[in-house]
Amino acid sequence: MPLNFKPGDLVFAKMKGYPHWPARIDDVKDGAVKPPPNKYPIFFYGTHETAFLAPKDLFPYEKCKDKYGKPNKRKGFNEGLWEIQNNPQASYSLPPASVSSSDSDVPEEKSTARSDGEEEQETGQAILPTAGVSSSDEEGSDKGGVKRKGRTTTPPSAKRTKHSSSEQEPDSASSSEEENSDSDQDFTPEKSTPRIQRRTTNLGKKNKIFAESDSKSDESEDEKKEEEQKKSPSSSSASSPSLSSSDSEAPVKKTPRGRRPAEKPAPKPRGRGRKAEPIPSSDSSDSDSSVDRISEWKKRDEERRRELEERRKKEQEEQLRRLREEEREEEERKKREKAEKGDKSDSDSDSSKSEVIAPPKPKKSSSSSDSEEDKKPVKEVKPVASEIKKGKKEKVRAISDDSDSDKKVKKTIKKTRPSESARKTNQKEKRGERPRGRPSKVEKEKKKPEVITARKVVKKEPTVEEKLQKLHSEIKFALKVDNPDIQKCLDALEELGGLQVTSQILQKNTDVVATLKKIRRYKANQSVMDKAAEVYSRIKARILGPKLESQQKTVQKVNTAEKDPEEEKQTGKVEEDMDASVNGDFLSQRIETAGDKEQDGEGQNLDNKTEMETKQNNHAEHNSNPTEETIECRLISSENQTS
């Protein structure tokens, strides 16, 4: 169970990372910071630091004396054991000599520890219980030590004022100036700090005092130089007390080092740095202040930036010049090529154009005589307006160009790249590139038909079946009742007769065969009837072959000899039977023929009856005696089976 303590009780206080430390429960005075609830204000012996701790971290001194009261290597621990026994009422207001009179081995360490603790309390930084934490020299000896946690509060303001008035009255000005000088050393080189720390850890007290005296002498030299350079008088005022101060003032000067452990070794590197640097002005500027160094760095950075910017500008200008030269050379080459082509193609140029174009030639100051001679035929070929525009552009370019010396330098640079330019020209010649500018109207007109022809070639040709369907629709449209177009129908029938039609295509498009049959009986125009019969016979001959042709010839001979209309009707019957075999059914074809006959008119009913009778008689005769029709039917059926 945690015990209840009163102000003045002696205890062992435990903090993380430290042994049980001899301490005293302190009394809270008026105006001081009050401790948080359930915590006590603690005063540590040996280091004279304060903190707020809970009762669980406090142990009575008398009970735990044998357990925790053993000597330890920690700085300030053995002094704390001595203080808790011989001087339990010790506080920060006591002079440093009161503690050092009893023990000759620890006088300077205690005084430095007290001053360090007081300075840390004044600055409001974290307070550490050991003297090794307050100074980097003492920390170097104890490598295994870890810093104690920072205290949450600071000691009472009354105690601070008393102690500061008692100890630092004579040296207040010097200490403040030294603090300023230490703050000026924020920008010292990083390389010097590890060397100084190593040296301080290995040196003893005498070496420290000797180093301080060296630093004082160095400071005095710096101040003299600063006076010569008319620097601020604050540094000179800091040098006079530093020279007159005795060895007893060494702990007072250590106070800012304890407060700022990282800045402690500042005076030592200044002396060494000056020896290495030969220029006195740089030494004085390094020792003046961080502001001066920052300004110097800024100036250097600005100078470097300016130099870099100037270099970049120069490089950009050179690149632009090179590009301009390359463009000029390319233009000259193109013009020369054009001139050569123009001489070959257009040898006879108009004299009037040459006279009009001649005056702008001498205005080109930068161009050489050779280039002018090469440009003359080119100008004669081009129109006047384009030449005037080019003359203006070349004037602007001539004004923007640099001197002839710059051109010579650029040409020398350009000669290093002859291979690249030669490659470019060869590629352009192969491609046949024109010079920069809009193409002429003649060339545009030439290009248009080429593109149109290419597009036409890309289009696919229609198939035979598509052509057949198209012609079929044209024939139907041409033979309308309202407005028939006989010539269009004849042209379509002629094209249809020229098509390479197969039996498979006809089987798919039976409507075409049916329309041809109907057109054969188109009584409105005899030429259409004859053309339809001719086309029909052509298609039939292609499908059935040469045997059918021979049979047709024999039939035609018989027809011409007899000239009987009945026989003509009989041949029509044969053709109808063949058509039916092509379309696949005899009965359906007969029904069609009957329907066509009914449409012819009422006046032809008697003729139709006689035709039907003759057909029946002919059919009976064919059945009794196999004639040409039976042979044709057999051939058609055999072809259908093979297909």
UniProtKB/Swiss-Prot annotation:
Q: Where is the composition biased (Low complexity)?
A: 90-104, 232-249
Q: Where in the cell is it found?
A: Nucleus; Cytoplasm
TM ranges: none
GO term, biological process aspect, one: muscle organ development
Primary location: nucleus
InterPro entries reported for this sequence: HIVI-bd_sf, LEDGF_IBD, PWWP_dom, TFIIS/LEDGF_dom_sf
Q: Enumerate the spans annotated as PWWP domain.
A: 7-64
Where is the sequence biased in composition, kind Polar residues?
194-204, 549-559
Q: Entry's PROSITE patterns?
A: PWWP
Q: Where is the composition biased (Basic and acidic residues)?
A: 107-116, 209-231, 290-353, 373-382, 417-450, 560-575, 608-622
Sequence ranges of Acidic residues compositional bias: 176-187
Gene3D superfamilies of this UniProt entry? 2.30.30.140, Conserved domain common to transcription factors TFIIS, elongin A, CRSP70
The reply to whether Coiled coil figures as a keyword in the UniProt entry is yes
UniProt keyword annotation of Lipid metabolism present: no
This protein's GO cellular component annotations are: cytoplasm; nucleus
Coiled-coil stretches noted in the UniProt entry, renumbered to this chain: 295-345
Could you tell me which CDD domains the record lists for this protein?
PWWP_HDGFL2 (cd20149)
Sorted alphabetically, the keyword list is: Coiled coil, Cytoplasm, DNA damage, DNA recombination, DNA repair, Myogenesis, Nucleus
Q: Where is this region: Disordered?
A: 88-450, 548-643
Function description:
May act as a regulator of myogenesis. Promotes the repair of DNA double-strand breaks (DSBs) through the homologous recombination pathway by facilitating the recruitment of the DNA endonuclease RBBP8 to the DSBs.
Which protein family is named in the record?
Belongs to the HDGF family.
What is the protein's given name?
Hepatoma-derived growth factor-related protein 2
What species is this protein from? Xenopus tropicalis (Western clawed frog)
